[in-house]
Design a protein with these regions (language model features):
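Alpha-helical transmembrane segments and their immediate juxtamembrane cytosolic regions
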Residues: 5-8, 14-388
C-alpha cells in the first residue's frame, strides 16, 4: 500500500513539474469558500421558491394553485427567478475551471457523466418516477391516461420526474461542449479573461440580453441554453480568475444598489404577468436585473462571504442532496394537504410544506446515499475507497 501511494505521489510531482516547465500556471489548491456559500444559499432560495411556486397564482399548470386571487408572496418569485439559476451556472463554470486544473480530461468526462448525466437519466427510472407520479396526480394528468399500458405510464412518470434535474442535464451538455472549446482555444481566451475590467463586466449585460433571446425551448421554458450557456462560459473564462472577482468586490455597494433598484422595478412593473415565459422572462429589464444580481452577489460574497462555520460547512455538504430531493417531499405533502386538510390557513401550509421540503430532502439523501448501486443511479455517488 505504501508503494502504491508513493508511486501516485511521484506521478503527481512529475506532472506538476512538467506543467510548470511548460510555463503554465502552477496548480491552484486555493479553496474558495465564498463559492460554496453562494451555492448552498442559492439552493435554499430555490427550495423556498418552489414552496411559493406550488401555491402561486401566475403559473397554474402542475401546481396546487393560489389561496386567493392576489398574493403578495408571489413577488418572491419575480425577485429570484431571473437570476438564481443563472448564478448557479456561473458558479458551475468557475468550479469546472478549478476542477480541470487538478484533473485530466478523462477524469473530467467520467466524473461529470457520473454526477450529472447518470442521475438525470438513469435516476429517473430508478427513483425520480415517484416525483413524476405526484406531479401527474397534482395536475390531474392520470385522468387522460387511464387506458394507457402500465409500461408506457411508467415511462411518462419517469420523464415527468425530471423536475429540478434539468439543471444538471444542461450542465452536462455545457461541460462536454467546453472540452471542444478548450481544444480549440487552448487557454488563449481564458488568459485574456484575467484582464477583464469591472466596467466591461457591467457592459456584458448586452450579451446577456442577446443570448437570452436564442436557444430557448418552446414548451419546457426552463431549458434556456442561450443565457445559461453564456453564464457558464463567462464563469469559466472570466470569473474563474481570482483577480477579476477581487476587482469586482471593490464595487459591491454600487452593484447591490443597482440590483435592488432594478429588482424592485422589475417586480412591481411585471407583477401578475407570467415571469417564466417570453416576453417577461427575457426582456431588457429582466436581463439587466439578472446580470447585476450575479455581479452583486459575487462581489459581496467575495468581500464578506469567504469564511465558514459549522453550519455553512454542513450545508455545503448537504446542498446537493437538498437540491436533488426537495421537490418530492414538497409535492407529496402539498398533494395530501390538498386532499385531507384543504382548509388549513395559508401560513400553516407554507410552513408545513417548507419544513417537509428541507427535512424530507435531508432524510432521503441520508437514506439513498447509503444504498449501493441506488446511490450511483440517483446521486452519482460511488463507493468511497478506504485509505490505509
Amino acid at each position: 500500500m505504501l508503494r502504491k501511494g508513493g508511486r501516485k505521489t511521484t506521478l503527481f510531482m512529475l506532472k506538476y513539474v512538467k506543467n510548470n516547465c511548460k510555463g503554465e500556471k502552477s496548480m491552484d489548491n486555493t479553496r474558495r469558500v465564498y463559492l460554496d456559500n453562494i451555492r448552498w444559499i442559492t439552493v435554499c432560495i430555490v427550495v423556498i421558491y418552489h414552496v411559493i411556486y406550488m401555491y402561486n397564482g401566475v403559473q397554474l399548470f402542475g401546481v396546487i394553485g393560489p389561496f386567493k386571487e392576489q398574493q403578495l408572496q408571489d413577488a418572491f418569485q419575480y425577485l429570484v427567478y431571473p437570476w438564481m439559476m443563472a448564478l448557479l451556472y456561473t458558479v458551475s463554470g468557475m468550479t469546472v475551471r478549478y476542477y480541470l486544473e487538478k484533473h485530466n480530461l478523462k477524469e473530467f468526462i467520467r466524473d461529470k457523466t457520473r454526477k450529472l448525466l447518470v442521475p438525470s437519466t438513469v435516476g429517473l427510472f430508478v427513483f425520480q418516477w415517484i416525483l413524476g407520479y405526484y406531479n401527474m396526480k397534482i395536475s390531474g394528468a392520470f385522468e387522460s391516461f387511464e387506458s394507457v399500458p402500465g409500461i408506457v405510464r411508467y415511462v411518462i412518470m419517469a420523464i415527468s420526474g425530471i423536475g429540478v434535474l434539468w439543471y444538471i442535464q444542461v450542465l452536462w451538455i455545457f461541460s462536454m461542449l467546453l472540452l471542444l472549446v478548450r481544444k480549440i482555444e487552448r487557454d488563449r481566451i481564458w488568459k485574456k479573461g484575467e484582464k477583464t475590467p469591472v466596467w466591461l463586466l457591467a457592459l456584458l449585460t448586452v450579451f446577456v440580453y442577446g443570448f437570452s433571446q436564442v436557444l430557448n425551448t418552446p414548451v419546457v421554458t426552463v431549458y434556456r441554453f442561450g443565457i445559461y450557456g453564456f453564464c457558464f462560459f463567462t464563469g469559466y473564462f472570466i470569473f474563474s480568475h481570482d483577480e477579476v472577482v477581487e476587482r469586482l468586490s471593490k464595487w459591491w455597494v454600487i452593484f447591490l444598489i443597482a440590483t435592488g433598484t432594478t429588482g424592485i422595478f422589475y417586480t412591481i412593473y411585471y407583477f401578475g404577468e407570467n415571469y417564466a415565459v417570453e416576453p417577461v422572462l427575457n426582456n431588457l429589464s429582466a436581463c439587466i436585473y439578472c446580470w447585476f444580481s450575479i455581479l452583486a452577489i459575487l462581489a459581496f460574497m467575495k468581500k464578506y462571504g469567504n469564511s465558514e462555520n459549522k453550519v455553512s460547512r454542513w450545508m455545503s455538504k448537504k446542498s446537493w442532496g437538498i437540491y436533488v430531493f426537495h421537490y418530492l417531499p414538497l409535492a407529496c405533502v402539498a398533494y395530501y394537504l390538498r386532499c385531507f386538510a384543504s382548509e388549513l390557513p395559508a401560513g400553516i401550509v407554507y410552513i408545513v410544506v417548507g419544513i417537509s421540503a428541507f427535512a424530507g430532502a435531508l432524510l432521503l439523501y441520508e437514506i439513498i446515499s447509503r444504498i449501493p448501486i441506488i446511490r450511483w443511479c440517483v446521486l452519482g455517488l460511488k463507493k468511497e475507497r478506504k485509505h490505509v
